[in-house]
C-alpha cells in the first residue's frame, strides 16, 4: 500500500507526495483534535498545532504546519509531521514515520519493523532493533 510513496526522500518534491493523498478527514487552519475511524483514513491537519489519532486501520496522518502530535494507533500507518516541532508515535503495526522540518520527537519501540526519518532539523527518536532509521541525530 505505501510502496508507491517516496517515504524518506528529503526533498520537497517527495514530501509533496504525502499531500497528494485525498483527505478523508480534514482540519482547519487553526489547532484541531482529529480522530480516525476503524477503517483506512487519510487525516490532514492543515495549519495550527493539531492532535491527530488515526485509531484502527492502516491510516495516513498529515500534520501540516505547526507543532503537531500524531498517533497512528493500530495498523500499519504513514505519519508525516510537516514543518514544525512535531511529536509522532506509530503505535502498533509496521509504520512509516517522517518528521519533516523542525525538531521532531519520534516514538517507535513497539516491536514492529518501522521506518523512521526525522527530516531536517535535530530530531530525537526512541526505537527498537527492528526499526530502520535515517536523519535522526539523537536516540533515547
Each PLM stretch: what is its role?
Residues 16-40, 130:
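Extracytoplasmic low-complexity, Pro/Thr/Ser/Ala/Gly-rich segments
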Residues 16-20, 29, 60, 78, ...:
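Alpha-helical transmembrane bundles and membrane-interface segments of multipass inner-membrane proteins
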Residues 107-140:
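Leucine-rich solenoid repeat scaffolds
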Residues 26-30, 36, 45, 54, ...:
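Glycine-centered beta-turn/loop sites at beta-strand termini
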Residues 85, 95, 135-139:
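Glycine/tyrosine- and acidic-biased, solvent-exposed loop/turn segments at the edges of beta-strands
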Residues 4-22:
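C-terminal region of N-terminal signal peptides and the immediate post-cleavage residues
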Amino acid at each position: 500500500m505505501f510502496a508507491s510513496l517516496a517515504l524518506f526522500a528529503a526533498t520537497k518534491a517527495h514530501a509533496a507526495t504525502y499531500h497528494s493523498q485525498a483527505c478523508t478527514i480534514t482540519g482547519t487552519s487553526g489547532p484541531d483534535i482529529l480522530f480516525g475511524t476503524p477503517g483506512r483514513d487519510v487525516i490532514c491537519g492543515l495549519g495550527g498545532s493539531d492532535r491527530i489519532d488515526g485509531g484502527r486501520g492502516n491510516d495516513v496522518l498529515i500534520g501540516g504546519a505547526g507543532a503537531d502530535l500524531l498517533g497512528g494507533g493500530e495498523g500499519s500507518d504513514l505519519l508525516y509531521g510537516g514543518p514544525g516541532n512535531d511529536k509522532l508515535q506509530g503505535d502498533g503495526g509496521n509504520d512509516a514515520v517522517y518528521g519533516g522540518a523542525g525538531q521532531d520527537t519520534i516514538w517507535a519501540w513497539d516491536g514492529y519493523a518501522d521506518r523512521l526519518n526525522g527530516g531536517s532539523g535535530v530530531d530525537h527518536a526512541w526505537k527498537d532493533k527492528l526499526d530502520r532509521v535515517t536523519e535522526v541525530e539523537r536516540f533515547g
